[in-house]
């Protein structure tokens, strides 16, 4: 088992610091013959594949599902839902996304709770082009940045080359304050959901009329990073494990309303919360159909510091599963719960989710709660 210093990973793998890389990214970012991007380390002559990132609207994804159904290739299936609960600190790896990604089975997809620019910026003022943003993801233990840093080379291209085009200046390839991925950028929803640097920041100037409809929902976009190599796993102290072997996974990037930030008009708080949760989970299941995913790992989007009600998240998971899983290739849907004993205050998240799934029509035979007390064997 080999380990990577979390403070120096960018330079160790790319050959230069992030700030140096940004000044000459055209020398380090290459397109491979399969169309995917890769990072070229000029010091070691190593090429690190980064997979392929794209943004798709829910409407476009639904069209793909309709095509699948029409050609008879969709199949009925009842995937097993596994809710994972750790009962001790030692069992952390069972619910830590970096570890889970590094042990992923083939055809796995991981949902990432991100922001509306597919970047785990901690604030509206964080400068992605400042020369440290990607590097610092490896130092953040929250699960969104942990998921991204685990597939660190893909993270580099998603932040610094989502607009890759060899025919334009390489300084225009990356995300910065003036140009970003916009999951809520469609004209029909933009005025209802004002975004600054990926963060929803309501000002009170939004339209007083907002009624959730299918057209608006289908305008929401999600980010899909296909064939992302998982270079790193669990963290210990200042180090992170180097994956061996190195799984190839898909990641889907979604976001939720932050109920601890400036809020929408009070009459819209619940409807906009539910609208974005529905988009997050339906979008994820649709991406899984697109990619013929067999093993899907979900997270409680908006359930941490964003303060979304656990009941709303559980309901959105249930409805998305019931609506779309029958069209998928899914064998398992795993939902790790990060907090010890799955508790958030006085609420047992696992039990709320289990009961919501059952009430939503999912048979108890298809739902399992896995309780973990000890670390995985390969972490002992």
Language model region names:
Residues 1-296, 300-380:
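Macrodomain-like recognition of ADP-ribose-binding/processing modules
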